[in-house]
């Protein structure tokens, strides 16, 4: 698991087509913007057929310890809320590149 600290609207890039960023950081809940063209997105448990988003864009509220599943192999976990920032853990296969947006240029 790669752990990154992000502030509101700071993007994490996963692979070539996935972007996730905390939009609103509250004291106990964070709203994430998830853009994942071509990947099903689920709220934290493996979805039943037809139960996940297929359009690739979601706004999801997560509490500490809750997950967002992207495709079959990528898991994003809200680990901690630290005032105006969050610690996010990303678990992905070793061949999938994970970058902070500011390093991608």
Locate predicted features.
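Compact, glycine-rich, soluble single-domain proteins
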Residues: 1-105
